[in-house]
């Protein structure tokens, strides 16, 4: 198999909706070398439209179609922003790997499906660059969860022959990849990451997130509320499993708070931070533990969560992936650049041991342009 080496751009917009992350990387079958990154702002009105769809409010086919168009335009703008920053042109890029914006993910129903919006045809037309997108549905077609897909990238770039490592990504949802020598790679969503904390601080302080956990650190964890939250059936389900904003959202949190009407909002924030740390730690211990926990995503900047992980996992070194040369803020965008490289090379991109698919498969669809 001849691998299609070159410069790739990865585009990621996660469940936190805090911006569009774009990275440039030189990729071949041996090396993924990040060369530049760029964060493109997410328009407030567009964010609110997406939240309305994600949280199960009524929508229409027309509204979904308009969102698909608007997100395609936004992702193209983000790619162009990176090109301007680097001085490169479309002809310098082999392909763009675009994850799209997940608005619904339902892998466990009788008719499992996942939906990511952001018209890849439009991205290709506006940028003049071949686009690889729609990565998740091929895995689901083979019986997989369609998620998480990033563990295959973690294994390729952070796997170790002898050291027990777990990669923790704390985005809107938190997920782990277990890289344990002699065992198949596993990866799954542990539960809420930043999503509930972000929504709660927005409701009460109109801030997009709790910077440096300043608010959470002023509060006191309510152990009864924490115990009730951790009794949710999702946390006890066996892997592989995946979840998202369609489940862990403000409606879920409000239902949890019905029996706790007098808890101060600041204590709820502290309890949500502890929920993330506790649910992650539980899953890590169930997997057999690790020597090193490498953390990426926005939550790696949350000192409260990082310190609680260290306390809950004695004997484990907790450190950011940046220590190993991989930007934690750009990890997922890098992964989709790498997945685009795999697809363009005709190579599989999923790990059945992670997603539960019946076979390895080439992921996504290619949207080529003429004379690139």
Curated annotation (Swiss-Prot):
EC number, as in UniProt: 2.7.1.170
GO biological process: 1,6-anhydro-N-acetyl-beta-muramic acid catabolic process; amino sugar metabolic process; peptidoglycan turnover
Keyword Lipid biosynthesis included in the entry's annotation: no
Molecular function GO labels: ATP binding; kinase activity; phosphotransferase activity, alcohol group as acceptor
Keyword vocabulary terms for this entry: ATP-binding, Carbohydrate metabolism, Kinase, Nucleotide-binding, Transferase
UniProt-listed PANTHER family: ANHYDRO-N-ACETYLMURAMIC ACID KINASE (PTHR30605:SF0)
Protein purpose: Catalyzes the specific phosphorylation of 1,6-anhydro-N-acetylmuramic acid (anhMurNAc) with the simultaneous cleavage of the 1,6-anhydro ring, generating MurNAc-6-P. Is required for the utilization of anhMurNAc either imported from the medium or derived from its own cell wall murein, and thus plays a role in cell wall recycling.
Assigned protein family: Belongs to the anhydro-N-acetylmuramic acid kinase family.
Protein name: Anhydro-N-acetylmuramic acid kinase
Source species, domain of life: Bacteria
Binding site for ATP: 14-21
Family matches, as InterPro entries: Anhydro_N_Ac-Mur_kinase, ATPase_NBD
HAMAP family the record matches: AnhMurNAc_kinase
Pathway involvement of the protein, from the record: Amino-sugar metabolism; 1,6-anhydro-N-acetylmuramate degradation; Cell wall biogenesis; peptidoglycan recycling
Swiss-Prot/TrEMBL catalytic activity: 1,6-anhydro-N-acetyl-beta-muramate + ATP + H2O = N-acetyl-D-muramate 6-phosphate + ADP + H(+)
